[in-house]
Regions:
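Bacterial N-terminal signal peptides that target proteins for export
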Residues: 1-11
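A solvent-exposed interaction/effector surface
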Residues: 6, 15, 20-182
Length: 182
């Protein structure tokens, strides 16, 4: 039931972003795979989470129920914000958030209203099943190092595909790694 609720809510918001994700899915010939860019700060509503990422589906279901109960309208695609490196942090100690950009600030427990203030990011797009995305993070971290940048905040993922109508191998995820020049 929770999965069905999530999939319906998630699907409604994803369709408005389909054109954006299609236009930015793959770099054109001659373009970089990763780009350092300035992005606007934004507000988001999230459910803070601790534990393994395998809990994400359950947490998304909880998030959508809390959003509905509080009449909070998402203003963009589902996002995940990740504070730890799963290669060095035990799964039970991982801190992360799952949420949506929002306009409202009247958010009640257990949800939190937060500001994304990291405006310089390295952006990359991953296509494929979520559980096989680890390689792009190593590539992005390597790109930062090779180009004189250092990570400067938590990783943000924007989920641009509708899981109701998209095969896992075609899922598109936009990834932001906040960064600064060394």
């Amino acid at each position: 039931m929770k999965k069905l609720i999530f999939l319906r809510v998630f699907g409604c918001f994803i369709f408005s972003f389909a054109a954006f994700s299609a236009a930015n899915a793959n770099p054109a010939p001659g373009q970089e795979k990763f780009t350092v860019k300035e992005v606007p700060a934004f507000s988001y509503c999230c459910l803070p989470c601790q534990g393994p990422y395998t809990n994400m589906e359950t947490k998304i279901g909880e998030l959508t129920q809390f959003l509905q109960a509080q009449n909070i309208a998402p203003m963009g695609p589902l996002i995940g914000i990740f504070y730890n490196d799963p290669n060095v942090t035990k799964p039970e100690n991982l801190n992360w958030e799952i949420g949506f950009p929002v306009m409202e600030s009247n958010v009640q427990d257990p949800l939190r209203f937060r500001q994304w203030t990291f405006t310089t990011v390295l952006e990359g797009t991953y296509t494929g099943p979520y559980e096989k995305s680890a390689g792009i993070y190593a590539e992005m971290m390597g790109w930062l190092e090779a180009n004189g940048y250092a990570p400067a905040g938590p990783i943000l993922e924007k989920y641009l595909s509708d899981p109701n109508s998209t095969r896992p191998e075609d899922y598109k995820t936009e990834i932001w790694i906040p960064c600064r020049k060394k």
